């Protein structure tokens, strides 16, 4: 059975998709209006999310409770006219499954009890059987996809190897990546060993999400922007490129979005991958990104490299815009969409925030954002 036949067989388990606007935009097909969703759209800005999380007890218990993970995924779709759902989970599920002891402290974000700081730590990391150690994620994907009943497509996701490695080595969030960058310059082979292990796990993890029901995949390279140019190529992009290439072998029909926060400088590098779309944060104008990607395609052709398909764009409203008035939000959305379609394009774009929606946003302002996107005339 070919990969395409296998994907078609998997789809028979679920209701037909009713709203494929986002998928059509990623394929550069005609769309009636701009598709939109929000990173972290199931989150703490919603009172119903807070209530469900309180019932679960803590964040990871919520992630591992199939019924509640399904519920919080669906909550924003009940409020808003969104064009996609995204699995409710966390980017740190892989290192948690590797035994690093993920926990959360109030006001301090995620932490690991057992950070990776020496070769013995690295050698102890298991080769994951994702369908065993992360079976709760796959159960949630299937449950959510079934509950959606074809309403909108479902995103699965993972953190990138580089981003996961920073958390695993630092033991949590970091402002300067002291230990991770220390290895990068003093013992790069150690870091490459870890990134290689993580890339293998990310491939298997995202593959399993597709089998469970995910229709689109996103790789969150949240801290790729902390790297220098050459370091980004070697320690982030190379592994992301490998992951996407293998996913395209296994599931050629599944779109993959690659989002590197702070990665606008490296769109030409990311163009040399099989990702269907690149996510932008708010620091890179969309019209300029389109121009960079068009020129990158020309250069790749001249260099006789494999010419990957044109890249759609996703993004990139500053999340802080949602603190503004409805009039301000609409004006900023219109400016963003003017930029997205400035060069005469009519598709190949998905509206989103430039990073996750924050817990302090008024839910009514999120609706203003979503409705303003749909109201814009392409």
Curated annotation (Swiss-Prot):
Q: Which GO terms describe its biological process?
A: protoporphyrinogen IX biosynthetic process from glutamate
- What PROSITE patterns has UniProt attached to this entry? UROD_1 (PS00906), UROD_2 (PS00907)
Q: Which Pfam families does this chain map to?
A: URO-D (PF01208)
GO terms (molecular function) for this protein are: uroporphyrinogen decarboxylase activity
Q: Which InterPro entries match?
A: UROD/MetE-like_sf, Uroporphyrinogen_deCO2ase_HemE, Uroporphyrinogen_deCOase
> Which SUPFAM superfamilies does the record match to this protein?
UROD/MetE-like (SSF51726)
User: Which reaction(s) does the protein catalyse, per the Swiss-Prot or TrEMBL entry?
Assistant: uroporphyrinogen III + 4 H(+) = coproporphyrinogen III + 4 CO2
Which residues take part in binding substrate?
40-44, 90, 167, 222, 355
Q: What is its EC number?
A: 4.1.1.37
Site keyed Transition state stabilizer: positions: 90
Which compartments is it annotated to reside in? Cytoplasm
Segments passing through the bilayer:
none
Pathway involvement?
A: Porphyrin-containing compound metabolism; protoporphyrin-IX biosynthesis; coproporphyrinogen-III from 5-aminolevulinate: step 4/4
Q: Which UniProt keywords apply?
A: Cytoplasm, Decarboxylase, Lyase, Porphyrin biosynthesis
Sequence similarity: Belongs to the uroporphyrinogen decarboxylase family.
PANTHER family the UniProt entry points to: METHYLTETRAHYDROFOLATE:HOMOCYSTEINE METHYLTRANSFERASE RELATED, UROPORPHYRINOGEN DECARBOXYLASE
Please describe what this protein does: Catalyzes the decarboxylation of four acetate groups of uroporphyrinogen-III to yield coproporphyrinogen-III.
Q: How does it assemble?
A: Homodimer.
In its UniProt entry, what is this protein called?
Uroporphyrinogen decarboxylase
Q: Which organism is it from?
A: Psychrobacter arcticus (strain DSM 17307 / VKM B-2377 / 273-4)
